[in-house]
Amino acid sequence: MRSKRDITYKKILSLFRNQNGSPFFNAKGLAIGVFSGCFPFFGFQTLIGVFFAKIVKGNIVLAAMGTWISNPFTYIPLYYFNYKVGSIFLNNSSNKILEKSLVIDDLWKQGRIFSIKLLLGSSCVGILLALICGTIVFFIYKIKSKR
């Protein structure tokens, strides 16, 4: 007897396998989706990925699937890593808020700094993961098209 999880897994895998278009078209779509999935815009990542896939003429279905890199199981590690990468690029310590007395202006400043670090780190990690995933998918579809 098959479980519901096996059927869903097979459907998703067949959806990935049965995409038409050139390898570059499919790779662009997935890369845009992975890039969009690295940003902390919960609920809008798929919309952003599909929007940008339409702009660059990439595969919309693979763009939507690429945003699944960010899911409830990966939110905390992914965004923590993105924040740390952003902190490295901005080169300032991230825990200075505990050393100060909490004033509203300080909270706004810390929120702005936190957001900038997270978005910068998300951009860097997103570009790297998009390049890696896009390259892998390009070669997968290139090999598939030769068969």
Each language-model region and where it sits:
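Hydrophobic residues within alpha-helical transmembrane segments
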Residues: 31, 35, 65-69, 120, ...
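Membrane-interfacial segments
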Residues: 86-94, 136, 140-145
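Transmembrane helix boundary and interhelical junction motifs in multipass membrane proteins
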Residues: 39-52, 56-80
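Juxtamembrane non-transmembrane "cap" segments at the membrane-aqueous interface
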Residues: 76-103
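Small-residue-enriched transmembrane helix starts and helix-helix packing motifs
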Residues: 11-14, 18-36
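Helix-boundary and loop/linker segments of multi-pass membrane transporters
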Residues: 15-24, 53-56, 107-111
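Transmembrane alpha-helical segments in integral membrane proteins
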Residues: 120-142
